[in-house]
């Protein structure tokens, strides 16, 4: 008897199909996960490359850094300190903006069109900027004191000769926002205690002498300095300034306590070979400068250095014949000063010089303005027996506004020291790389490189 057997494979086929589908799904999931990982890697590398490109553009194209100066600082056999510059132009513009004097100055500009200011009473005496605001320039650099290297921002000043810092014992208002020297935290501190007072054009500070290790760049040496405990006589300049103390780079005869200036003391202790320091102020960066101690870095200038003998070991001053347009002063005393932002001249001389030059004195402001392309402005000449130094208008003019016509501040201001005494400040030192030589009692000049 034949048997009829039927086998139902439908469930097997269904299971097999399910298995196949499951396997395909798993494979698809694995492929998707792999693709996902690669996509994440793609995004990562894309962001990395884009970020690197963006950084390159920022660092090298849009806001390029001066890598040349870093190379010079790293390879020089001398000590080079980079410092920041706060100049009078910045302070004046801040005051002008605070008191909304822009329109006031704009009206004064109409002198060039009408010979009269349209609104002579737009300003008032309360809006004034003091002469110190115009004359002073501050070079801020860092140094440390103590074996624990307490950091301070210093002004490098060729017009004084002592080093001072605010003391932890100072309770006056100006010290509240400053870095204070604490002798208790330094194991190398030596007590002196002699009380002193120092007088500056901007006021006075007082304190006492101390001795500790001072570190400038990579040079450390024991040095006698002043701990300042009272800054009230130095206000508001001290509170408003971005500095803690001052490093004097003048002559010993200027110092209180007959202390050798820092650079001379470095040579006394065989830390440097020459008692020499130099200033280089780049023409293309008004807020940076470089102080070299112990020698001359020839990569900062071009041509030959020429030297002038000092006429007195008090300030860095020399005898020069001055030619300002049609005016001449023979054997004038010219003080080369890192703390002055302008060329200064006696008031009587300057009034004569400005006659007929279309230069306007702004009422209530110690500010002289003119058009930036004023063809009447002459090249200034400073002559010694063997050398001639010139200063073109581009160096003593600073653009402040543009009203369709460019308006510049004239960086030549009246300061009455003596009848024939002039100060060669920032404009002169920006054109001429300047050498201050204690050993030979000279100052040297060479054309500063406009760009390294």
From Swiss-Prot:
GO BP: acquisition of nutrients from host; proteolysis
Name of the encoding gene: PMI
Organism annotation: Plasmodium falciparum (isolate HB3)
Principal EC category: hydrolase
Function: Digestion of host Hb is an essential step which provides the parasite with amino acids for protein synthesis, and regulates osmolarity.
Keywords, ordered alphabetically: Aspartyl protease, Disulfide bond, Hydrolase, Membrane, Protease, Signal-anchor, Transmembrane, Transmembrane helix, Vacuole, Zymogen
Catalytic activities: Hydrolysis of the 33-Phe-|-Leu-34 bond in the alpha-chain of hemoglobin, leading to denaturation of molecule
Processing and modification events after translation: Not N-glycosylated.
pH profile of the protein: Optimum pH is 4.5-5.
Predominant place of localization: membrane
Entries under SUPFAM superfamilies matching the protein: Acid proteases (SSF50630)
Protein name: Plasmepsin I
């Amino acid at each position: 008897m034949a048997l009829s057997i039927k086998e139902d494979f439908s469930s097997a086929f269904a299971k097999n199909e399910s298995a196949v589908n499951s396997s395909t799904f798993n494979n698809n999931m694995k492929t998707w996960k792999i693709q996902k990982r690669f996509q994440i890697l793609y995004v990562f590398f894309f962001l990395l490359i884009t970020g690197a490109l963006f950084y390159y553009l920022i660092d090298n194209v849009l806001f390029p850094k001066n890598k040349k100066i870093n190379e010079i600082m790293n390879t020089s056999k001398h000590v080079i300190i980079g410092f920041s510059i706060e100049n009078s132009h910045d302070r004046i513009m801040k005051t002008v903006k605070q008191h909304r004097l822009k329109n006031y100055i704009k009206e004064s500009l109409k002198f060039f069109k009408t010979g009269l200011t349209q609104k002579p009473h737009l300003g008032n005496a309360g809006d004034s900027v003091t002469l110190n605001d115009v004359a002073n320039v501050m070079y801020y650099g860092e140094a440390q004191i103590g074996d624990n290297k307490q950091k301070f921002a210093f002004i490098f000043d060729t017009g004084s000769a002592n080093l001072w810092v605010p003391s932890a014992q100072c309770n006056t208002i100006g010290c509240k926002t400053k870095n204070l020297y604490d002798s208790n935290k330094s194991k190398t501190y030596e007590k002196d205690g002699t009380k002193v007072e120092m007088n500056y054009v901007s006021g006075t500070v007082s304190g006492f002498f101390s001795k500790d290790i001072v570190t400038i760049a990579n040079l450390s040496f024991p040095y006698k300095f002043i701990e300042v405990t009272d800054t009230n006589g130095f206000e508001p300049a001290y509170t408003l300034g971005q500095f803690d103390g001052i490093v004097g780079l003048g002559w010993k005869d200027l110092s209180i306590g007959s202390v050798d200036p820092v650079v001379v003391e470095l040579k006394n202790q065989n830390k440097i070979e020459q008692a020499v320091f130099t200033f280089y102020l780049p023409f293309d960066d008004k807020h940076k400068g470089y102080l070299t101690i112990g020698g001359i870095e020839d990569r900062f200038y071009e041509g030959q250095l020429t030297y002038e003998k000092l006429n007195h070991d008090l300030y860095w001053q020399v005898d020069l014949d001055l030619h300002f347009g049609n005016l001449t002063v023979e054997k004038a005393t010219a003080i080369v000063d890192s703390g002055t932002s302008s060329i200064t001249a006696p008031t009587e001389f300057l009034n004569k010089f400005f006659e007929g030059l279309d230069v306007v004195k702004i009422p209530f402001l110690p500010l002289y303005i003119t058009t930036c392309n004023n063809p009447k402005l002459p090249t200034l000449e400073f002559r010694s027996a063997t050398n001639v130094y010139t200063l073109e208008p581009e160096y003593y003019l600073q653009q402040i506004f543009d009203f369709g016509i460019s308006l510049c501040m004239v960086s030549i201001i009246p300061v009455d020291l003596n009848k024939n005494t002039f100060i060669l400040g920032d404009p002169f030192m920006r054109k001429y790389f300047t050498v201050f030589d204690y050993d030979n009692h000279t100052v040297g000049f060479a054309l500063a490189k406009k760009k390294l």
